[in-house]
């Protein structure tokens, strides 16, 4: 983990879904840094070296005693986008972090530490890989999926993504392109409160458990709502899945 305070400047912001924005930052400081895991060679100037799934901790203000308020955000962009990083945030009314980000303008700087975190892909997988996300928990999952699809591994790569309504959807073109390029990848998007007709209705937990008997040596990566993670994790363990060897998770709180 890099504990050194670094800076980046906002270069783009776009609305991707209802109350959900993508923020793109250019790394400002030219010093090389090392990721939280050993990853080989040093970074070159203005690069942020990280593994898909890791996060950064951002100073979003100060409390009443003048102490910094820190919030953690997963990196949504792949490492190949050298010199920049993107974050996908659901803006929550009254949230300290949301208020900070909503006030950012092009060229504004943020201070952060990282990258850090252990919610990353295993170095290899013998069987199927199942990613389960809710809401903006998809942010670190997408680059993780891209990483494993570049490997010559035998198993299927499956994504189950749960959202509330159609207005919460984003990234459909990217997911469709991944499906078209990689026959072993399949994406299933479920809406729990669709406003109109939608084929895949309900929460993601049930469909994942229904699929479990057909999976071969699966590894599960769970990211998003903490309640979903705990419920699904408990159900998987009850069905013989190893918590230590087969389940990785990262809780998000919108």
Q: Model regions: which residues?
A:
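A short, basic/flexible loop-to-alpha-helix module at the beginning of a structural domain
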Residues: 114-125
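Short, conserved phosphate/pyrophosphate- and ester-handling motifs at nucleotide-, phospho-/glycolipid
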Residues: 53, 137, 225
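Histidine-anchored nucleotide/phosphate-binding helix
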Residues: 138-150
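Reductase modules of NAD(P)H-dependent flavoproteins
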Residues: 2-4, 160-254
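Ferredoxin-reductase
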Residues: 2-106
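Phosphate- and divalent-cation-binding pockets in alpha/beta enzyme and binding domains
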Residues: 120, 140-143, 231-232
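Conserved S-adenosyl-L-methionine
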Residues: 126, 147-157
């Amino acid at each position: 983990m890099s504990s050194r305070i670094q800076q980046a400047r906002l270069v783009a912001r776009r609305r991707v879904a209802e109350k959900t924005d993508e923020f793109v930052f250019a790394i400002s400081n030219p010093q090389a840094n090392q990721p939280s895991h050993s990853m080989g060679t040093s970074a070159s100037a203005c690069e942020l070296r990280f593994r898909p799934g890791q996060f950064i901790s951002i100073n979003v203000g100060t409390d009443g005693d003048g102490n910094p308020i820190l919030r953690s955000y997963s990196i949504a962009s792949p490492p190949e986008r050298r010199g920049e990083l993107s974050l996908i945030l659901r803006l929550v009314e009254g949230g300290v972090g949301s208020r900070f980000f909503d006030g950012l303008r092009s060229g504004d700087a943020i201070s952060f530490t990282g990258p850090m975190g252990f919610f990353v892909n295993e170095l290899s997988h013998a069987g199927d890989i199942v990613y389960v996300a809710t809401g903006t928990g998809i942010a670190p999952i997408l680059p993780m999926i891209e990483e494993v699809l570049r490997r010559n591994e035998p198993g299927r790569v499956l994504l189950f993504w749960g959202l509330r309504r159609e207005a919460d959807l984003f990234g459909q073109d990217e997911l469709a392109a991944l499906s078209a390029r990689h026959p072993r990848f399949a994406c299933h998007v479920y809406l729990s409160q669709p406003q109109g007709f939608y084929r895949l209705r309900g929460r993601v937990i049930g469909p994942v458990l229904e699929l479990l008997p057909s999976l071969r040596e699966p590894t599960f990566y769970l990211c998003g709502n903490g309640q979903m993670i705990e419920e699904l994790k408990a159900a998987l363990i009850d069905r013989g899945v190893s918590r230590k060897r087969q389940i990785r998770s990262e809780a998000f709180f919108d």
